[in-house]
Design a protein with these regions (language model features):
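Short acidic DE-rich linear segments
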Residues: 130-134
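Structural detector for short beta-strands of small beta-barrel domains
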Residues: 1-8
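Acidic, low-complexity, intrinsically disordered interaction modules
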Residues: 15-126
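A short, compositionally biased
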Residues: 8-15
Protein backbone atom coordinates (compact mmCIF):
# COMPACT_ATOMS: atom_id res chain seq x y z
CA UNK A 1 0.00 0.00 0.00
CA UNK A 2 1.28 3.46 -0.91
CA UNK A 3 1.36 5.77 2.09
CA UNK A 4 2.44 9.21 3.26
CA UNK A 5 4.40 9.16 6.53
CA UNK A 6 5.11 12.14 8.77
CA UNK A 7 6.29 12.73 12.33
CA UNK A 8 3.25 13.43 14.50
CA UNK A 9 4.17 16.33 16.79
CA UNK A 10 1.39 15.56 19.29
CA UNK A 11 1.73 11.76 19.57
CA UNK A 12 5.55 11.82 19.17
CA UNK A 13 5.50 8.95 16.67
CA UNK A 14 5.09 8.50 12.91
CA UNK A 15 1.61 8.74 11.42
CA UNK A 16 0.97 6.56 8.36
CA UNK A 17 -1.68 7.92 5.97
CA UNK A 18 -3.07 5.77 3.12
CA UNK A 19 -2.71 7.17 -0.39
CA UNK A 20 -4.86 4.45 -1.99
CA UNK A 21 -7.61 1.98 -1.20
CA UNK A 22 -10.82 2.37 0.77
CA UNK A 23 -9.02 4.27 3.56
CA UNK A 24 -7.33 6.73 1.20
CA UNK A 25 -6.59 10.03 2.93
CA UNK A 26 -6.96 8.58 6.43
CA UNK A 27 -4.31 7.73 9.01
CA UNK A 28 -4.21 3.93 9.11
CA UNK A 29 -1.54 3.47 11.78
CA UNK A 30 0.94 5.08 14.15
CA UNK A 31 4.36 3.54 14.68
CA UNK A 32 7.75 4.15 16.25
CA UNK A 33 9.48 2.36 13.34
CA UNK A 34 8.49 2.56 9.65
CA UNK A 35 10.07 1.08 6.53
CA UNK A 36 9.17 2.30 3.02
CA UNK A 37 10.27 1.31 -0.50
CA UNK A 38 10.17 3.37 -3.74
CA UNK A 39 10.14 6.63 -1.79
CA UNK A 40 9.74 10.31 -2.52
CA UNK A 41 10.41 13.11 -0.03
CA UNK A 42 7.61 15.69 -0.11
CA UNK A 43 7.46 19.26 1.20
CA UNK A 44 4.45 21.53 0.67
CA UNK A 45 5.91 24.96 -0.03
CA UNK A 46 2.67 26.63 1.09
CA UNK A 47 2.87 24.73 4.40
CA UNK A 48 6.54 25.65 4.79
CA UNK A 49 5.76 29.32 4.20
CA UNK A 50 3.04 29.12 6.86
CA UNK A 51 5.63 27.75 9.33
CA UNK A 52 8.00 30.60 8.50
CA UNK A 53 5.25 33.19 8.81
CA UNK A 54 3.63 31.86 12.01
CA UNK A 55 6.80 30.43 13.63
CA UNK A 56 4.74 27.34 14.48
CA UNK A 57 5.16 23.80 13.13
CA UNK A 58 2.46 22.10 11.07
CA UNK A 59 2.20 18.95 8.96
CA UNK A 60 3.59 19.91 5.57
CA UNK A 61 6.42 17.45 4.93
CA UNK A 62 6.88 13.70 4.86
CA UNK A 63 7.79 10.66 2.80
CA UNK A 64 5.62 8.74 0.34
CA UNK A 65 6.32 5.13 -0.55
CA UNK A 66 5.22 1.52 -0.39
CA UNK A 67 4.76 0.55 3.26
CA UNK A 68 6.73 -2.53 4.31
CA UNK A 69 4.91 -4.07 7.24
CA UNK A 70 6.15 -7.11 9.12
CA UNK A 71 8.35 -8.66 11.74
CA UNK A 72 11.69 -7.64 10.22
CA UNK A 73 11.11 -3.87 10.03
CA UNK A 74 13.24 -3.25 13.14
CA UNK A 75 16.22 -5.24 11.80
CA UNK A 76 15.94 -3.54 8.40
CA UNK A 77 16.03 -0.14 10.12
CA UNK A 78 19.14 -1.14 12.10
CA UNK A 79 20.82 -2.16 8.82
CA UNK A 80 19.81 1.12 7.16
CA UNK A 81 21.14 3.16 10.08
CA UNK A 82 24.55 1.50 9.58
CA UNK A 83 24.85 1.64 5.77
CA UNK A 84 22.40 4.36 4.75
CA UNK A 85 22.59 8.12 4.85
CA UNK A 86 20.73 10.11 7.48
CA UNK A 87 18.16 12.55 6.13
CA UNK A 88 16.79 15.61 7.89
CA UNK A 89 14.35 18.44 7.28
CA UNK A 90 14.17 21.81 8.98
CA UNK A 91 11.78 24.34 7.42
CA UNK A 92 13.81 27.23 8.86
CA UNK A 93 17.02 26.05 7.12
CA UNK A 94 16.00 24.05 4.04
CA UNK A 95 13.37 24.06 1.32
CA UNK A 96 13.50 20.27 1.10
CA UNK A 97 14.80 17.18 2.84
CA UNK A 98 18.62 17.00 2.83
CA UNK A 99 21.37 14.49 3.53
CA UNK A 100 22.37 15.46 7.07
CA UNK A 101 26.15 15.11 6.57
CA UNK A 102 26.36 17.08 3.31
CA UNK A 103 23.17 19.19 3.25
CA UNK A 104 22.63 17.89 -0.30
CA UNK A 105 18.97 18.09 -1.36
CA UNK A 106 17.24 14.73 -1.69
CA UNK A 107 13.91 14.00 -3.33
CA UNK A 108 13.76 10.21 -3.64
CA UNK A 109 15.26 6.96 -2.36
CA UNK A 110 14.88 3.23 -2.95
CA UNK A 111 14.40 2.50 0.76
CA UNK A 112 13.68 4.77 3.74
CA UNK A 113 13.65 3.76 7.39
CA UNK A 114 12.21 5.96 10.14
CA UNK A 115 12.46 5.49 13.88
CA UNK A 116 11.53 7.45 17.01
CA UNK A 117 14.30 7.94 19.57
CA UNK A 118 14.76 10.02 22.72
CA UNK A 119 17.48 12.66 22.68
CA UNK A 120 19.72 13.52 25.65
CA UNK A 121 16.95 15.58 27.27
CA UNK A 122 14.41 12.78 26.79
CA UNK A 123 12.52 14.53 23.98
CA UNK A 124 11.19 12.11 21.37
CA UNK A 125 12.38 12.83 17.84
CA UNK A 126 12.32 11.06 14.50
CA UNK A 127 15.39 9.73 12.70
CA UNK A 128 15.26 9.06 8.95
CA UNK A 129 17.76 6.99 6.96
CA UNK A 130 17.74 6.34 3.22
CA UNK A 131 19.48 4.00 0.81
CA UNK A 132 19.73 3.90 -2.96
CA UNK A 133 20.84 0.63 -4.52
CA UNK A 134 22.05 2.00 -7.86
Amino acid sequence: MRVFVYFNLHKKCFSIKALEGDRKGRVVAHSNTVLLESCKFKVSEAGRQRVLREKRKNVHAGVTGVWVNGDRVESHFEFLSMVGRQVTYNPYKYESFVIKATEQLVDKADVVGMKVFADAEGTKRGAIYMRDFK
